[in-house]
Amino acid sequence: MKLPIYLDYAATTPVDPRVAEKMFQYMTMDGIFGNPASRSHRYGWQAEEAVDIARNQVADLINADHREIVFTSGATESNNLAIKGVAHFYNKKGKHIITSKTEHKAVLDTCRQLEREGFEVTYLEPASNGIIPMERLEAAMRDDTILVSIMHVNNEIGVIHDIDAIGELCRSKGIIFHMDAAQSAGKLPIDVQATKVDLISISGHKMYGPKGIGALYVRRKPRIRLEAQMHGGGHERGMRSGTLPTHQIVGLGEAAAIAKAEMATDNERIGRLRDKLWNGIKHIEETYINGDLTQRFCGSLNVSFNYVEGESLMMALKDLAVSSGSACTSASLEPSYVLRALGLNDEMAHSSIRFSIGRFTTEEEIDHAIETITQSIDKLREMSPLWEMFKDGIDLNQVQWAHH
């Protein structure tokens, strides 16, 4: 067993060896290294064919048409292109956008930028289970609303939104629906023929593909128009200029094909391991799960251990690669804005750990994790005066702390 045990699959996934092997065939002089836009010789044609195959593989994953897939550098760029692209193209129709307070920073900061440009954004509060109630979404809709951007699976707490219902509501009001599927593409079934979603952001490195590659699904019927955010040679039907990185695109395609074929068996095993982990630690006193218990992705577990300081817990769990909050914001000492939006106080938000399980997690690793967590919590609480006061029946909210 390799230490530390990797339980941070929501931050990134290792590249599947089958994907890496395929990618290597598209880099060197011995392989297919040409520019897919070189139309005058075989090197270019072969690269273009590889890109076409990968585009079809990504399209198949979500049951889309290959012409609806635009390659980007990742989900952050896809989110930017979708939200800014729609806002700039449809701004004559309206300047109101709806999103939620628990979105990824790539969505929130893009919306903040649009606010500076004169757009109005409504940030919806989730319920305490982390899910946006449909009535709140409907109540926020106005005649000048042009876009709703709601994530499929939350990156910190793993809750799943009812995208079918959101899609129906948006379509009935003539509002474009963008979904950030960084955490769900390749892990949960998505069918654009069945779900009325107009734009989908996809990330390669969240589904055992390489970092630095992603895609944006852009619906053709009814047709969604975008204003490009990256200008140049007019690649990707004018929506995203820049030479296509063949090896990364091939990697994304292969990862998508593997995910589609193995999703059901992967999820069954991952779900079993997650339940084993939760059943192994839920007996620890004052331990709470964050986010809805049933409407959640099988690989995700966000747990608060009350009366334990999150940072010291992270240090104690040095044999486990886990995170507090998302990787994109965990470097800051601010408590998770996602957990705060659920109504957790600073202390509870600070004492939370995100465990995320994936394709290469083993039973043995979960057993070791349970043991490590249990021992660490016991040890840290032994040293904690707050825990002692709590055990003595003192209500810590009533304590008057001396100010220095």
UniProtKB/Swiss-Prot annotation:
It catalyses: (sulfur carrier)-H + L-cysteine = (sulfur carrier)-SH + L-alanine. GO terms for molecular function: 2 iron, 2 sulfur cluster binding; cysteine desulfurase activity; metal ion binding; pyridoxal phosphate binding. PROSITE patterns: AA_TRANSFER_CLASS_5. Its EC number is 2.8.1.7. The active site is at C328. Pyridoxal 5'-phosphate binds at A75, T76, N155, Q183, S203, G204, H205, T243. It is found in: Cytoplasm. InterPro entries: Aminotrans_V_dom, Aminotrans_V_PyrdxlP_BS, Cys_deSase_IscS, Cysteine_dSase, PyrdxlP-dep_Trfase, PyrdxlP-dep_Trfase_major, PyrdxlP-dep_Trfase_small. Homodimer. Forms a heterotetramer with IscU, interacts with other sulfur acceptors. This is Cysteine desulfurase IscS. It comes from Shewanella sp. (strain W3-18-1).
